């Protein structure tokens, strides 16, 4: 077969791509750092995070009480609060400073504050206030204290309304306290828990972040082992852009295709989270999401000079990226600039699409905007990766030629000296 023929070039390109794939795959499993980020973290971290929030709610949350009123009304509020299943009045303090110290020592997760004029204002028919102070480092305890306080306050408000209305029958009292009756029926997040609300988004974000960390660390290792500190080595197998890009991309796509199915199908089932995922939908959805993450990571790998750099570039972005998806913060309250900035990252559309698939049973046609956006990102980042690798390949060849010329000059100089 002639070397100039098209068939020979195609076969040679496929052979080189397989060689690059084999080399990159071997490096992934030999490099401890890359192995941790690409294999161990996606396997273990979701289990730990899901286990923490598996209970969905917490019970008997320790709470301090600062009662400066010492009245019948404040004691009634505290008694009802302590009788609830979610919270418990553990400490009674004489000042705010004493309660703050308990929160600082993690003895309690919050405290209730009753001012001295609490009962006086109620008896005058004025609006009274109860201060609710919560430690927001754990959302489950914050939710338990805050919602229990609201429920008790609503119950006491109803009692005051009944007293002031002067109704004659129980039906009159019902109409006074609840003129419009309604039943709250959760449709998607049936447990109303934190895990079902946030965990699907976190699982999808883990895919992107661990992939970026693994690709970045592998790129840093390649530069450190390269004599010219270049991302792409000078070799006969690394002679074309497409074979390099496809060879490297195939490695991470194969690894994260398995991890993606594990995170989206296995983990929710293990912890009994709401999951309405179907095989066909999730396979069609993960294909553009994983590809866009792979090409996005390969494009950014040119910025990594040392292995440690990737930690600075990726790790701190996890929480902001989760906020910008509109999952833990209302999308309507996010400025337009940051909404546009979030479109750069595949996780934005990946999280929004997967939440609809997992919690609402959506099909690919129901998430068409996110599905199209992921394919657009795949195409854009693929072209950007090819351009970046082309520049890196040129730079590597240029430095290799310069190094060869310098070596020849040194050899000639040594021969002159010896003669």
Question: Residue locations for each model-derived region?
Answer:
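Extracytoplasmic/periplasmic domains immediately adjacent to an N-terminal transmembrane anchor
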Residues: 1-196, 391, 397-419
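Alpha-helical membrane-protein architecture signal
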Residues: 14, 18-22, 196, 237-238, ...
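Loop-to-transmembrane-helix entry motif
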Residues: 28-35, 206, 247-253, 257, ...
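Hydrophobic core positions of alpha-helical segments in small-molecule transporters
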Residues: 37-38, 200, 246-247, 310-313, ...
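Hydrophobic alpha-helical transmembrane segments of multi-pass membrane transport proteins
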Residues: 44-47, 185-268
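Membrane-spanning alpha-helical segments of multipass transporters and channels
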Residues: 48-49, 91, 101, 254, ...
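Perimembrane helix-loop junctions in membrane proteins
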Residues: 53, 57, 220-228, 306-309, ...
